[in-house]
Amino acid sequence: MIVTTTAEIQGKEIIEYIDIVNGEAIMGANIVRDVFASVRDVVGGRAGAYESKLKEARDIAMDEMKELAKQKGVNAIVGIDVDYAIIRAGMLMVAVSGTAVRI
C-alpha cells in the first residue's frame, strides 16, 4: 500500500476516492510520567526514551489507519496528516488521517 503526505502520487492516477481513514494511539499517564522521569538520559539534547514512545504511538496509529484502508479495499492513502495532542493530565494522543484511494 502506498502512503503519502501529498495529495497525489507521482506517476499514478487516482481512479477513485473512497473515504477518510484514521488511526489513533493514546499513551497513558504512567507511560508519559516514566518517559519524563528518564529525560535525564538525554544524549545530545534529545530525549531518546520519549522519542521512542512517540514513534511507537505513531506506528500504532499508522498501522490502525492502514488496516482500516485495507478493509475498504484500497491500495493507497493520500494526504496523510499526523497530529499530537496532550489530553487530560499527562496523556498523549497521536492521531493520523488520510484519504483512502484506488490507483
Curated annotation (Swiss-Prot):
HAMAP family: UPF0145
One Pfam entry name: YbjQ_1
Keywords noted in UniProt: Plasmid
InterPro entries: UPF0145_dom_sf, UPF0145_YbjQ-like
Family the UniProt entry places it in: Belongs to the UPF0145 family.
Keyword Cell cycle appears in the UniProt entry: no
Source organism superkingdom: Bacteria
Protein name: UPF0145 protein pXO2-45/BXB0052/GBAA_pXO2_0052
The keyword Nucleotide-binding is assigned to this record: no
